[in-house]
């Protein structure tokens, strides 16, 4: 992994203003009127990742979320799902094997959050094991999607912890120089 130049300050500001506060307010309204809160949309996680990693959205319709990173989010201790659609799944899987992966784990109405970065070289064997399964899946009639997951334990063991938030407070952030 190259030297890190991450933007913790702006990412944490984004988290407070656009993820945590609005989410908690919306969650209360959803509950009050008997709805299940759907959570934070993927595009918000991708924007959060782009700010943190000083990256940009991938302009292509297929492939990784950002130019240099794939972004995943899941509840604390949950696996991270990867989903591949029939017509672009192979291209997406191949593209994701060429970028590092940013994993956000969250809990307690997003009050707690960890961000970890996993070098793509550690994920390539997993992606290679999925490739024949993905191809077989699409040979079956009616199959439009292929889903697999990277376990939380793998991410914790192999990922570099970039930041950690507890009860809405930033309690850990890796040095901006990557140390």
Label every model-predicted segment.
Residues 1-68, 73-179:
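Nucleic-acid endonuclease domains
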């Amino acid at each position: 992994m190259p030297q890190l130049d991450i933007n913790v300050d702006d990412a944490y500001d984004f988290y407070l203003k656009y993820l945590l506060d609005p989410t908690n307010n919306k969650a209360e309204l959803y509950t009050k009127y008997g709805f299940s809160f759907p959570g934070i949309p993927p595009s918000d996680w991708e924007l959060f990742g782009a700010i943190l990693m000083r990256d940009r959205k991938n302009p292509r319709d297929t492939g990784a979320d950002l130019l240099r990173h794939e972004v995943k989010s899941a509840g604390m201790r949950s696996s991270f799902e990867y989903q591949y659609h029939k017509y672009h799944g192979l291209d997406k899987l191949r593209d994701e094997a060429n970028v590092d992966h940013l994993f956000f784990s969250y809990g307690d109405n997003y009050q707690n959050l960890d961000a970890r970065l996993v070098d793509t070289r550690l994920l390539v064997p997993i992606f290679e094991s999925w490739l024949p399964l993905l191809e077989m899946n699409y040979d079956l009639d009616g199959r439009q999607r292929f889903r697999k997951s990277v376990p939380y334990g793998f991410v914790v063991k192999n990922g570099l912890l970039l930041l950690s938030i507890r009860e809405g407070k930033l309690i850990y952030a890796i040095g901006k120089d990557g140390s």
